[in-house]
């Protein structure tokens, strides 16, 4: 029977590295008595690591590490290497030795070893790990190959993996509901206008099923599922109404009145009935006045359209940014076409005015020199102006 099986319940033996070296190992090397000796003497090279659990067990509690004293022996009588082989495998050192300090003084070193099944160099690595402690006063000194050491053996702790059953499945259902709810918002504008009526009908059906004398809030408190559903429906109706208002404002902007290009209105009778000397001046002044009035009206319409568009752009929110950028491009193209037409009309009017001024100057010079030739030119000019008036009416 194990002599350490009668310890009181709850007793666990977990000494620190400093306690193992400075108290237990130092007394063992000095052959001093240990008051309560829980550490056995084990010949490590004749016992497999899985047999240590029963030999080094303390009490009836489950243990995760086991402690024992072992005496190091040389592998060869004339060599310096330590024998760490067993019947089933061998212990192989890994990494560098760790120094153990107590009150800033070096008291020992710790070596880490791993157990391999089979024979070197084809051994199979196992989960058994051993910490071997030895007394040492010089960290860079040559380790002693003989003497007592205290060892701690344990199995490598595997990373804890959480089972899938530990997770609650309710958030996944909520996520699916939210996905379906968000997908319904991406439908067409026509379906958006139909969906609110459908939700109103469902709310009316819920009200019909409520008990008599119980208001909607009390019924929702007694039915948490209905309460959550109603909150989602209210939130959805709010989103649909907001999108509907944005669509209407967007359509009202797209249906702005078309800007008409300025037209030159002239009367044939005025062109033919006015005296030759005064008709050109009056026509030019009236033409310039009409152009100025049309330009002023055109600018007012553009300013009004820009104000409406800016107010719509500021109030519509981030959801309509891409569509409004497209509308800006359409408006720019439309304004550019109107301006190009206006510039063309202005250029043609200036060319006609220059031609009329030139012909008037030539007529005055010819009238002074040859009155008969001047009268012939006056008749030709009257015919040309009448034809130009007819052409302008067709523009």
UniProtKB/Swiss-Prot annotation:
Membrane-spanning residues: none
NAC domain span: 7-156
Ranges for region Disordered: 344-395
Effect of deleting the gene: Embryo deffective.
DNA-binding region(s) in UniProt: 107-162
Keywords for this protein: Activator, Cell wall biogenesis/degradation, Developmental protein, DNA-binding, Nucleus, Transcription, Transcription regulation
Domain of life, source organism: Eukaryota
Keyword Transcription regulation (UniProt): yes
Family named by the database record: Belongs to the plant vascular related NAC-domain protein family.
Subunit structure: Interacts with NAC083/VNI2.
Comment block on domains: The NAC domain includes a DNA binding domain and a dimerization domain.
Name recorded for this polypeptide: NAC domain-containing protein 7
